[in-house]
Amino acid sequence: MQKKLTGLALAAALTLAATAHAASPSSNEAATARHFAALVAGKEPRTAELSLFFSMMPKGGDLHHHYSGAIYAEQFLDWVDKENYCVNKTTYRIESNKDVVAAERAKPAAQRTCLSSTEVFADAGLYAELLQRWSTKDFYNHGAIQTPPDRTFFDTFGYFGPVASTNTADGLKTLKQRAIAENLSYIETIFELSPFVQNAQFDQQVLASGLPPAALQALLANWTQSLEQDAVFQKSIAAYNDNVNASSAGIDDAHFTMRYQAYVLRFLSPSQVFSSMVAAFKAASLNPLVVGVNIVGQESVNVSMRDYSLHMEMFKFLKTKYPNVKIALHAGELALGMVPPEGMAFHIAEAVDVAGANRIGHGMDIAYENNALGTMQKMRERNIPVEVNLTSNDYILGIKGQAHPITLYRKYGVPFVISTDDAGVSRNTLSNEYVLFASQYKTDYAEIKKLSYNSLRYSFLAEADKQRLLKALDARFARFEAQIAAADQGSKRIKP
């Protein structure tokens, strides 16, 4: 009977690694490749063993990572008491108005409708329901009538929003500890919304029908100049960078590095979006920790669709003004039927051709885009990777397996990286994203290892930091492959 390496055998055999005969790095790599091939062979991949394998495997970076979406609901609930807020037990929303909170606290306990987090934790039924509102927990095994998954996903941010920007230093420390625990050395997190202001006249002008391109550029230039001369607005940018610096103090060390993207919300008014972009680009140009700019928010809602091309022109304008600032854009996070077909025909192409995106987030509607092959060729030739988020693409869009455009990107040579998106909302890990990839698509160890390296190569890190982490990744993989090779040898001594 052929002896197979099981997860239990691998775990037991790791104790033999320290005394195993030293093998060459190349032979260790070959042994690891053979071991991995056995895990994905056949009709049913060995997912438990893949989970162990990827938990152990060094992972370079997580490049599509929303800070607020990465924090688990349990930690947000802890922050409710820290901020002296309460949670409405009927709506499950956080009440931050101090007068309302004080009035609730003055009532007898039986009459309160707004509870402390301690009281929520003590009520098992209420706590379970809150977790289902504040994350996607139990969605697939819950029998009640539910809102659609995309609504459920995006609604979570409204529940924990009042505390999402509090205690950021604690939040980043938690994310660092969790990353180190799963052998992840770098996170590039979409951290905080950049400041913005409203300008009704600007909104009316840029949304005017038939506005010539030159007129739009003039409007953008004029308002940029006004914003640069606005002392209050400039102070808000300085305060933004101060918050990044204070929150991130002590995060970077020999084992872990984190960098930050400023982001704008695509469903706000044009003046709010553009002023937020101006602030984000300025912040990134001044602070080496802020390595890029992103645009986020549900792409399928009316304002996001209406203003998509306008937003790309705004990015183009600011990219010219700040050529060294990198941009990673959520583009094509759409599924057939979400919007009319013409709405799926150009988003990725405009992000690449107009905005000048350095990375594309999601890129899910590529099969429906005009000149999809041409766009993918440009992405391949310009080394513009796609940030692939398998869990959220399945949950929000209902797209997985062979329906996922990762099959197209792989076929046509477009680089891609594996990332988490919102691991706290989806209650997931980067290791599990690799498990999903390996179990759903035919792959080999060489591709898996390349993906780990690419998640650093395509990061927005300064070149010196990038080379430092790549060198460290070499050493980490050498140790990992030696472990796997030794465990493989040791497992042959273990009876099945």
Role assignments for model-derived ranges:
Residues 1-21:
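Gram-negative bacterial Sec-dependent N-terminal signal peptides
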Residues 23-496:
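Metal-cofactor-binding active-site regions of metalloenzymes
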